[in-house]
Amino acid sequence: MKTKKSKSTLWFWLIILLAIIVTIIIIAVTVKGTTQVISDATFADWMSKSPQIDPNADKYWKNVIIYYGSNNTVVVKGSYFLESTGKYVNFVAYLTQKRFETIMADKPYPWPALVYQGSVGMALLVSLAPLLIYVLLFGGIIWFMMKSSSGAGAGAGNIFGMGKNRARAEKSDVKFANVAGIEEEKSELVELVDYLKFPAKYAEAGARAPKGVLMEGPPGTGKTLLAKAVAGEAGVSFFSIAGSEFEEMFVGVGASRVREMFNDAKKSAPAIIFIDEIDAVGRKRNNGMGSGGNEQTLNQLLVEMDGFGTNSGIIVMAATNRADVLDPALLRPGRFDRVIQVSLPDIKERKAILELHAKGKKIDGSVDWYRVAERTPGFSGAQLENVLNEAAILMVREKRDIITITEIDEAIDRVVGGPAKKSRAMTKQDKDIVSYHESGHALIGLKLDSASKVQKVTIIPRGNAGGYTIMTPKDETVFSSKKDLFATIAGYLGGRAAEEIMFGKENVTTGAHDDLDKATNIARRMVVQFGMSSLGMTKFLTMAEESYGKMEGTYSDETAARIDAEISKILEESYKIALKIIKENMETLELLAESLRVLETITAEQIEYINVNKKLPEEVLEQKNRMAKEDEKIKKGEIIDIKVEDLDID
């Protein structure tokens, strides 16, 4: 029994074949109607004239073919240029073989003639050869488009596969055991697995299973992995598609794809439909007139999720980074009954994720995963996986047998700032500036109770940064107080403050531009979002969407000026705090800067040693002695044989 899909494909090819036949008939009739039958005398006259003008030219004769017809008849067909009309005329001449030989008289043909000793059908085939070539070329293009569309999962129901469902059923082999660090989110989804396995139990209790689950969170937190784990645990079909795949250049295609996707899921029920980046298709509908393709697609999705039809056994899961831009009709109960926040992992969750991804890798048993988790605040699960992958690559590059904390530490730096640029030339002045700048950041972290803890300081360039300081929160809390935010801003401004104190206000460099950007962003949020300024407990929206998609500000120019003044006030107060701390701890600043100049990178343990003992660590003193001896040899003109493996390079 033929399916609806195969029938539509058959009709498509029948229409194409009919169009080709009609085209051939029209061309044949047109050619036949304009062809003149000439006598042997006319043919002889044309043959006697054209060679006299230019026997080697192909000006007068075109597309001439000669073939043998019935009863020893010679048929000559082609086009001849008439000087009287200035145009070519299509002709056909029927000659006896003897008459043809008399006219030609053993002369060379004045045209590139084609002689066929065969049937009339063969000659007709040759005459239609150019047309057949075009037909085959056209058919090949159609076949290629059909093949491509079908291979891409678009189906072959129409010429481009538009409107066809791009999601295909697959069985997921991911389990909850493959997902680490988001235990609360997993517990929310256990009920879905139970419903998909035992739907009758919920029906007897009169309970309705959630029709949809929306997962919101930053990129790389495991939203897609969770959806696959639900399908894998339940053992049901898993349909996945990106929100952008619904749309095409033609209006209505997205709605058609939504319908077919749900129809396919019904055939495979129980099933899960997962829509990644649903904000691409589920954005809020504006108040403007008209109904574009996006709105049609959204409307169809709303109907399929909770309309007149029934989609029993189908659960829609979706992921987005921007739930705030989704249409309210999409978020109501009955469509997405549950909205799960998948946030960035905390320190314990990061430790669990690292341990999960460490399986199957050769890692030194002395690696403390809790310490590694401390160094990676704000990292997503995807970034943590990338850290261990980079560490494995470094192990192979360095031709080592196991991954040590050295490779992991370097991998974290590579993920944060990119590969180190040790070959970048840096003058002594630049090195001094960067050393004091980064020491300023570290000093604020050491002396301010609310500031972040310093984990590492380096002056080795990475990316666009001449150096950087890694600081992590002392305690990973959910909320931040006004005091905490002031301390964070002071930490960002500590580098600029150190430059001003050491080199003067007029010699402050551009190295603090990124610090200023981050500090200003926090200060602005304190004013316009958190109500932490003299403007009071008011949230100022910078832009608002009005009717017909028009965007307008929500406050006056006078208020904007007051907001800018408050931001400047917060930055100035934080900068004064940074200046005060650095001036009171100049000895520690000098020791930190000297350690950076010598080692280029100092760890949390070395920083704490300097802060407590007010002297340089042993590693710094040893390196200074080696450098002094080498300088002495250079002054004496001695040749120094330095091997790469002898250099103290991290």
Swiss-Prot record:
It is found in: Cell membrane. Residues 1-10, 145-650 are cytoplasmic. The keyword rRNA processing does not apply. Zn(2+) binds at residues 437, 441, 515. InterPro entries: AAA+_ATPase, AAA_lid_3, ATPase_AAA_core, ATPase_AAA_CS, FtsH, P-loop_NTPase, Peptidase_M41, Peptidase_M41-like. Keywords: ATP-binding, Cell membrane, Hydrolase, Membrane, Metal-binding, Metalloprotease, Nucleotide-binding, Protease, Transmembrane, Transmembrane helix, Zinc. One of its GO terms (biological process) is proteolysis. Binds 1 zinc ion per subunit. ATP binds at residues 217-224. It comes from the Bacteria. PROSITE patterns: AAA (PS00674). Acts as a processive, ATP-dependent zinc metallopeptidase for both cytoplasmic and membrane proteins. Plays a role in the quality control of integral membrane proteins. This is ATP-dependent zinc metalloprotease FtsH. It comes from Mesoplasma florum (strain ATCC 33453 / NBRC 100688 / NCTC 11704 / L1) (Acholeplasma florum). The gene is ftsH.
